[in-house]
Amino acid sequence: TSRTPARPRSRSEDCAERACSARFALVVDAARATSWLRCESKTSDTWNLAVVDRPVVAVASATYRFQKQGNRYRLDTEARASGVLAVFYSGTLVQVSEGVMDAQGFVPARYSEKRGRRPERRYRFDSLSRHIRQEGDPAIDFAYPDGTQDRLTIFFQLGLLARADARRFRPGQKFVLPLAGSRRIDEPFFRVVRQERMRTNAGEFDALHISVEKPGDQDAPRFDIWLAPELKMLPVRIRVFDHGGGGKIVDQVLRRRPQEIL
């Protein structure tokens, strides 16, 4: 029997397969530890972070980029310190995560992190052996469970999980999301606090407040995240309190609504 010829792909279908992104920028007020997120482009997912101090002087900037083609993704960030902050953080911070996205969300395959003049950290996720290889001298292998995230994907994975299973995100619910740490798997403890009304430069949003801590480690950073259902559970606020870093607080707040949403 003869087969029906395949329908030629339309231009719009080809475009849909290409890397998509929306451009965002963040600004952090170090006094209030507040940052802002604003959309700049429909063609690529990019977040730009600027840290300012009194009187609103830029001391650092960072850019986050997200690309997706088919089921493969790339998420990267570059942060560069300047001014006062450069005294404490020399050089740049570069992070790159690559992998696939499936029904469970982000599945990292490679992650790298370079901080200033320090040696680059590189992680490879072997989906067959279920081990992560942290490259170095010596290299270290450790097992990882399903759903493990890296330091870039974890916040966005949280939003995807909330969209997929709202029952896990009712106030009072608690859960663990495994995170690839240095030489081991960390298990941050997530607690759903409550729905709160968040006021941002992008408008007001109902947002789900989630607190994140690492049990048994008083020096580990604490995170608070607010996810907005109106924005498909993307964060409208992320606040980090670093106990081990002298009590520093970084608070990021949405500045402009993104035009492209994961």
Question: Predicted regions span which residues?
Answer:
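Acidic, serine/threonine-rich low-complexity disordered tracts
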Residues: 1-127, 167-262
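Hydrophobic, well-structured mid-protein blocks that either form specific transmembrane helices
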Residues: 121-164
